[in-house]
Curated annotation (Swiss-Prot):
Transmembrane segments: none annotated. It is found in: Cell membrane. Gene3D superfamilies: Cytochrome-c3 Hydrogenase, chain B. The gene is nuoD. Keywords: Cell membrane, Membrane, NAD, Quinone, Translocase, Transport. It is a peripheral membrane protein. It catalyses: a quinone + NADH + 5 H(+)(in) = a quinol + NAD(+) + 4 H(+)(out). NDH-1 is composed of 14 different subunits. Subunits NuoB, C, D, E, F, and G constitute the peripheral sector of the complex. It holds the Pfam family Complex1_49kDa. Its main location: membrane. InterPro entries: NADH_Q_OxRdtase_suD, NADH_UbQ_OxRdtase_49kDa_CS, NDH1_su_D/H, NiFe-Hase_large. This is NADH-quinone oxidoreductase subunit D.
Length: 446
């Protein structure tokens, strides 16, 4: 369409061509501007230094006004070479690396890696019952702490600072339990091939039951603050929409997939660590949006409390039971008393290892320095992390170190949905969509 047809008149000036219009011409002008796609578009970087991108995530947004026309994710700012480093450590030492990937759910990182090793060693059925129950207990505590961070940070990004405050208040209680049981608040390296590092300390079950009772009183606060808040609901409902077909096409899992109403949870569909013996329900929603993902995380914390109660009751009947496989060629002597430094350097430990048998000392030295050998082969074992399917593909060439260890991190896979969720929406809703995915960049970049 010619310019003179669009506008009522024009004239050439020293500043270029100037158009003049009358009050009746605005519809024609709007049509002309809509055809000129480059007119109003700008490209902005959101992140990697941004308080609302859940770490060092860079989003390249192309905007037209406040509408997002294209969204791309830039990753890699937190790459630490974890998978490559694991090839230069023993199978047991690898746990100390993988626990640092998704730093909000370290027990799940350890669990998927250890399950892969145990499958290659063919010792899955020989892991002590108490060790399996402790693994389930720790993972469900970890699920609660991770969901609390997701809800707290998501609320903070929307301006609901009270949600952030109480979310981190409860998470601190979980970290205190982790410190009591493992000695560390994060990066535990507690789940080992063949079992766990050590037994539960005295009084731990009482502390866990006290936490469960307290959380049952605290969780309704989140419903009062969020579900009953029309502003909070208005910012989440209909935002970041992605239906079941889109989730399956992109390989999305976790709350993002279950928000479409599809009850896919590996604890039910492909049980591990005895999850098939626990009574709990898979939480779903049917809105396929950010609000549904929030409600799923809130409901899953209730289910985790149910599992924790069952695990605590089982542990009460397993007092004194072993927590490490009896095979001395695989498991470190976890039944010995642990010193105050957490390194196993108690007097009983030293006396048994160094003072009773030269063969025992040699064997222990080789086990610690060289490690055990894993038969050649490969295995992929997934677990249901707070963010979705977290899997480890471990490959052995018959040596004492992994030939290859690769992880399928749900944050990496789910981050593909950024473009689909954000494009066509407002720039303010990009943050809501990202928060509903709940990515952890340590797991994305590794």
């Amino acid at each position: 369409m010619a310019d003179q047809d669009l506008y009522s008149g024009s004239s050439e000036t020293t500043e270029g061509r100037v158009f003049t219009v009358t009050g009746q011409d605005w519809d024609s002008i709007a049509e002309g501007l809509a055809e000129d796609e480059a007119q109003e578009r700008i490209v902005v970087n959101m992140g990697p230094q941004h308080p609302s991108t859940h770490g060092v995530l860079r989003l390249i947004l192309e905007l037209e006004g406040e509408t997002v026309t294209e969204a791309r994710a830039g990753i890699g700012y937190l790459h630490t070479g974890i998978e490559k480093n694991m090839e230069y450590r023993t199978w047991t030492q690898g746990v100390t690396f993988c626990t640092r990937m998704d730093y909000l759910s370290p027990f799940f990182n350890e669990m998927t890696y250890v399950l892969g090793i145990e499958r290659l060693l063919d010792i899955e059925d020989r892991v002590p019952e108490k060790a399996q129950v402790m693994r389930v207990l720790l993972m469900e505590l970890n699920r609660i702490s991770s969901h609390l961070v997701a809800i707290a940070t998501g609320g903070m990004e929307l301006g609901a600072l009270t949600v952030m405050t109480i979310g981190f208040r409860e998470r601190e209680l979980v970290l205190d339990l982790f410190e009591l049981i493992t000695g560390l608040r994060m990066n535990h390296a507690f789940i080992r091939p063949g079992g766990v590092a050590q037994d539960m300390p005295p009084g731990a079950l009482d502390e866990i039951r006290g936490f469960v009772a307290l959380m049952k009183k605290r969780l309704p606060e989140y419903a009062d603050l969020c579900n009953a808040n029309p502003i909070f609901k208005g910012r989440l409902e209909g935002i970041g929409h992605l239906d079941l077909a889109g989730c399956l096409a992109l390989g999305l899992t976790g709350p993002v997939l279950r928000s479409t109403g599809y009850p896919w949870d590996l604890r039910k569909t492909q049980p591990y660590c005895g999850y098939e013996t626990y009574d709990f329900d898979v939480q779903t929603w049917d809105t396929s949006d950010s609000y549904g993902r929030f409600r799923i995380r809130l409901n899953e914390m209730w289910e985790s409390l149910r599992i924790i109660e069952q695990a605590a009751d089982r542990l009460a009947g397993l007092d004194g039971a072993p927590v490490m496989i009896e095979d001395k060629k695989i498991g470190w002597p976890s039944q010995l008393a642990i010193g105050s430094d957490g390194m196993g350097n108690s007097l009983d430990h030293i006396r048994h290892i160094m003072g009773e048998s030269m063969e025992a000392l040699i064997h222990h030295f080789k086990l610690v320095t060289e490690g055990f050998r894993v038969p050649p082969g490969q295995a992929y074992v997934p677990v249901e992390s707070p963010r979705g399917e977290l899997g480890a593909h471990v490959v052995s060439d018959g040596g004492t170190r992994p030939f290859r260890a690769h992880f399928r991190d749900p944050s990496f896979t789910n981050l593909q949905a950024t473009s689909v969720m954000a494009e066509g929406g407002m720039v303010a809703d990009v943050i809501v969509a990202i928060a509903s995915i709940d990515p952890v960049m340590g797991g994305v970049d590794r």
